Structure formats: structure tokens, C-alpha cells
């Protein structure tokens, strides 16, 4: 029996569409600013990130944590209201394969991936609650973080934490979001807990092929989508956040203090409900930056960790 080359190609393409490419970590968080100068001071001076151009959006600016991860800052839209989060993004080995995979799973995807001027490829979808999610295939070569001539002309102090270890966002319904993040994308349970033992406020799941995680910040507001009317910009900034990993909290805070990078109201480090040392700072528009140790210093409340913790050795 003869099988045409065309048939074999279609079969291979179909199989590829059913295979999820690796999702290896958090790529970035994109937030809005109402004051670009103040925001630059915060991310460059206080947090120590590296400013660079935004190859994806000429109106934006990137503040790099390392060569692959960054905070994307965009101008505040007129209709933003209390929202300061534009999207969250995850790194994948193949943006095109991921686009095909999600399409095969019934997720609405764009017709093609976008190609940025830095050599990265990306596309954007919406999760079941309407949050924008990007999948980014990093450039094949990344230069510039240590002053080497490369893709970006970067300046600024070294970041206080050299990896984004998690991102968090407001979530109304865990089961609805789980169908996408755990069911389709393969995110793995990591930890869950709350301010009280009998109530879950936070649900964390790691990317399937790494140790960075997404934290659901569960709201007690009405189930559905969008931002509940009773949530202020400040409260929303606490929920929609990102976290930088550090090895030693005492050393990190001491560095910030000695270099006058703590602002007028210095944050107080504390052991969180997950047993990890952490402290919170906020950008000028209220987006929370959570500095957190990689591993717990005490027993977590509510549940045990069900996956390996991130490590500093995993940093790019």
C-alpha cells in the first residue's frame, strides 16, 4: 500500500498539534503606569532592574530581571479604571507549536505568531476568566545583561532578586481556571493556603517544565470575570503581583537599606503563611513586588508543598 507524502505530512502536523511544547517558566508581567518617570525610578533605583527598549510594543519599556525575564511597563489606557495589569506571560520552547496545541484544544488563538525585533516569537490568548496570557519563545541568543554589546543597551544596578519565581492574579473561580492552566497547559499543584486554616485564599501551581509558579489570588466577590466593583486600585495591586526570589532575606534587606532603596516607609520582612521569608514593596501605581526566599524557613500552614521549590542555581 502506498501512502502519499502529503498524507504523511498531515499526520505529522496533526500529531505535533496534539503535543504541548515545554512551558519552562515565567517570561514577564506587563503592567500600566500613570507616571513613567516615577515608575522608572522605582524599577531601576529601588528594585535594581535593567531598563531596555520594548521590542514587542514601541510604546512600552522593559525592566529586565535577567536575560529572559522582565517587567513590561505600558502607558495607562484611558479606560483602565482601577486595573494596572495588562497580561502575564510564560516562556515556551516553541510559540508556533504552542499556538497549534491550544487551537487543537479548542482555545481561540491568533492566525499566526508575532515576531519581535529581538528575535523572540509570541502570541496572546485569553484564559476562561478573560485574563490576557502570552506565550513567549525567547530569542535564540541573549546578550547585554553584563554590559556585553548585544541586543539591548541596558543600564542600572543589579536586581535585588535575579529571578521572577512567581506571578499572581485575581481569580474568581478556581475550577474554571484549573480547566485551562492545569487541564490544558499542565500546570502542577504546588501549595495552597489562606489567612485562616479553613479558608483558601491562595492557590499556587508550577509551570509543567520548571519551578516558577502562578498564584491564584482568590476573591470572595461574585464569581465570573472582570474586576469586582468593591476592589480598589490598591487592593487590586496586592492581588496582581510578581515575586523576585532571593537566597537570604536579611542580606537583601540590608543591601536595600544601605543603598537607600527602601523608600519612605521601609517594608518589614515576615514569614508568610507558606513558611517563606518575604517582604512587599509597591510601584507608584500600586503593583506589588514580593521579594521572597526560595525555600521555606518554617512549616507552611494549611498544606504541604507538593512540588520542588525553585533554586537559585536555576537562574539564567
Describe these PLM feature segments.
Residues 18-21, 24-34, 61-63, 77-163, 168-169, 191-197, ...:
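Vicinal oxygen chelate
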Residues 21, 30-70, 116-126, 168-221, ...:
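Core segments of cupin and vicinal oxygen chelate
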Residues 34, 44-48, 94, 103-107, ...:
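Sec-exported extracytoplasmic/periplasmic mature domains
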Amino acid at each position: 500500500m502506498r501512502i502519499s507524502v502529503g498524507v504523511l505530512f498531515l499526520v505529522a502536523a496533526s500529531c505535533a498539534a496534539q503535543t504541548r511544547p515545554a512551558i519552562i517558566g515565567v517570561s514577564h508581567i506587563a503592567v500600566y503606569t500613570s507616571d513613567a518617570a516615577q515608575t522608572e525610578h522605582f524599577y531601576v533605583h529601588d528594585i535594581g532592574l535593567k531598563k531596555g527598549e520594548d521590542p514587542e510594543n514601541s510604546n512600552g519599556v522593559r525592566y529586565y530581571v535577567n536575560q529572559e525575564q522582565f517587567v513590561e511597563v505600558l502607558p495607562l489606557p484611558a479606560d483602565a479604571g482601577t486595573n494596572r495589569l495588562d497580561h502575564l506571560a510564560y516562556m515556551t520552547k516553541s510559540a508556533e507549536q504552542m499556538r497549534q496545541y491550544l487551537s487543537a484544544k479548542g482555545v481561540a488563538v491568533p492566525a499566526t505568531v508575532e515576531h519581535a525585533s529581538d528575535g523572540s516569537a509570541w502570541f496572546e490568548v485569553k484564559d476562561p476568566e478573560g485574563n490576557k496570557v502570552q506565550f513567549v519563545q525567547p530569542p535564540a541568543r541573549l546578550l547585554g545583561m553584563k554590559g556585553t554589546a548585544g541586543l539591548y543597551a541596558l543600564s542600572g544596578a543589579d536586581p535585588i532578586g535575579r529571578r521572577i519565581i512567581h506571578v499572581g492574579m485575581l481569580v474568581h473561580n478556581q475550577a474554571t481556571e484549573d480547566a485551562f492552566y492545569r487541564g490544558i497547559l499542565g500546570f502542577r499543584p504546588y501549595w495552597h493556603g489562606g489567612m485562616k486554616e479553613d479558608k483558601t485564599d491562595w492557590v499556587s501551581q508550577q509551570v509543567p517544565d520548571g519551578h516558577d509558579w502562578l498564584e491564584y489570588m482568590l476573591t470572595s466577590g461574585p464569581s465570573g470575570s472582570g474586576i469586582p466593583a468593591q476592589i480598589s486600585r490598591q487592593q487590586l495591586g496586592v492581588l496582581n503581583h510578581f515575586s523576585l526570589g532571593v537566597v537570604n532575606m536579611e542580606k537583601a534587606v540590608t543591601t536595600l537599606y544601605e543603598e537607600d532603596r527602601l523608600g519612605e516607609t521601609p517594608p518589614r520582612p515576615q514569614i508568610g503563611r507558606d513558611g517563606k521569608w518575604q517582604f512587599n514593596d509597591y510601584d507608584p501605581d500600586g503593583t506589588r513586588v514580593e521579594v521572597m526566599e526560595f525555600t521555606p524557613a518554617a512549616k507552611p500552614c494549611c498544606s504541604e508543598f507538593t512540588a520542588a521549590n525553585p533554586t537559585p542555581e536555576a537562574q539564567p
